[in-house]
Curated annotation (Swiss-Prot):
Keyword field contains Membrane: yes
Keywords: Cell membrane, Membrane, Transmembrane, Transmembrane helix
Cystine crosslinks: none
Transmembrane segments: 15-35, 56-76, 86-106, 131-151, 176-196, 253-273, 289-309, 349-369
One Gene Ontology cellular component annotation held by this UniProt entry: plasma membrane
UniProt topology in membrane: Multi-pass membrane protein
Cellular compartments annotated: Cell membrane
Protein name: Uncharacterized protein MG306
Length: 393
């Protein structure tokens, strides 16, 4: 029997930090929209009224990237956790997927999603070591998949380097993109190295231990840390078993690539929505589907290393710079690019942030209700895999 007396996730420090990130995202989004893209309230009305209603179906294509990402958050975590006899109802998984997406959107570098996943699994009764195993064994694949699909786009873009070099904004955007892609590769490598390196485990847990000691929480001695991570090395063995499940590992990589590709094709859908009939000077007349995919792919990656929620500002800067650099643009095309990029962010970031934010509030209400409903409840324990008996199926 375990007594649930406090909800450590909702302490003052976490609430203040989260509120800061949310307010910061809103402020940056407004500043970028008004001062960089030059979109006013009247412009928003104009954008909405200018939508070609014959192409409303393309809105679903834009939103599809968001829905696929949410569905993937649910599928991969459910798929991996079921091996550890973990159970949650379908609606809890669905709510989990939306809240993970919320943290991806509103926290810098999407750093909030993994702590939330850890908290959610542990709160549902999973052992800490098992929860860490699930989170780390799925975390590296997004960065790795981005690297695999972005480098080819970057090489195609580099063929027109001289055009980019002639324009200051596009020249800066080019090098931002290269930095973002290198960042993806480094993060993916760090995930794998940290997971397998015993000394890194000792170092990281020693830092955590010092923090727990400072908070006057239970902590391990140096000998206990050494025994757990060097002599027994249980986590390394379990992580190795998990990563050697080649079918699942390849599935994680390919599925992450599909999620990214679907998302990056969404810009084409936006310009299909905003195209003007009876003219050949639309963005989609000047740029092919593959062109827009490459530009979106690189623009998103360029903001990966910038510690602002959803790469706000950097993504729009790179995208508009490239779109204006490769083709001669008149005022009509320039305005369509500006309006299209804003609409793309509205449908892929701002509205999803509002919707998933509501889901986050629903989840908070659920947690508070559960704590008030039960004072003493038996906590289920989800055991880790037995090294001797569990085989990859």
């Amino acid at each position: 029997m375990a007594k649930l007396t406090t909800n450590t996730f909702f302490n003052t420090k976490n609430i203040v930090a989260f509120s800061f990130f949310l307010v910061f995202l809103i402020v940056i989004s407004v500043i970028v929209t008004i001062f960089f893209l030059g979109v006013s309230v009247d412009d928003v009305k104009t954008i909405i009224t200018a939508i070609n209603y014959q192409n409303w179906g393309w809105i679903f294509v834009v939103i599809l990237g968001f829905l696929v990402s949410v569905l993937w958050n649910v599928i991969i975590n459910w798929w991996v956790s079921r091996r550890f006899c973990f159970y949650a109802s379908w609606w809890e998984w669905l709510l989990f997927g939306f809240v993970v997406q919320f943290f991806q959107i509103v926290t810098p570098l999407s750093l909030g999603q993994d702590p939330f996943r850890l908290y959610w699994f542990i709160k549902k009764g999973m052992k800490k070591q098992t929860a860490v195993l699930i989170v780390t064994s799925t975390g590296a694949f997004w960065n790795l998949s981005q690297a695999l699909i972005t480098w080819p786009s970057f090489f195609v873009l580099s063929k027109n380097y001289q055009l980019l070099a002639n324009n200051h904004n596009s020249f800066v955007s080019y090098w931002l993109s290269l930095t973002g892609m290198i960042f993806d590769v480094v993060v993916a490598i760090l995930f794998i190295v940290i997971a397998f390196n015993k000394k890194m485990h000792v170092l990281i847990y020693s830092l955590v231990n010092q923090f727990r000691k400072w908070l006057k929480r239970p902590y391990l001695t140096k000998e206990q840390i050494y025994q757990r991570f060097i002599e027994k090395a249980e986590f390394n063995k379990l992580y190795g078993i998990e990563m050697r499940r080649w079918g699942l590992t390849i599935f994680k990589l390919l599925a992450n690539m599909v999620v990214a590709i679907v998302s990056y094709f969404s810009l084409f859908g936006v310009f299909m929505i905003t195209k003007t009939v009876n003219t050949t000077n639309n963005v989609i007349d000047q740029y092919s589907l593959i062109d827009l995919f490459n530009i979106t792919n690189i623009a998103v990656t360029a903001s990966n290393f910038i510690p602002v929620a959803s790469g706000e500002g950097a993504t729009q800067f790179v995208m508009t710079s490239f779109l204006n650099a490769f083709k001669p643009t008149d005022q009509f095309l320039h305005d369509q690019i500006k309006d299209g990029v804003f609409l793309w962010r509205l449908l892929s970031v701002y509205l999803p942030a509002i919707f998933t934010g509501i889901c986050f509030v629903v989840w908070i209400v659920q947690v508070i209700w559960e704590f008030k409903k039960t004072v003493n409840v038996p906590l289920k324990t989800v055991n880790t895999v037995s090294l001797e008996t569990k085989k990859d199926k």
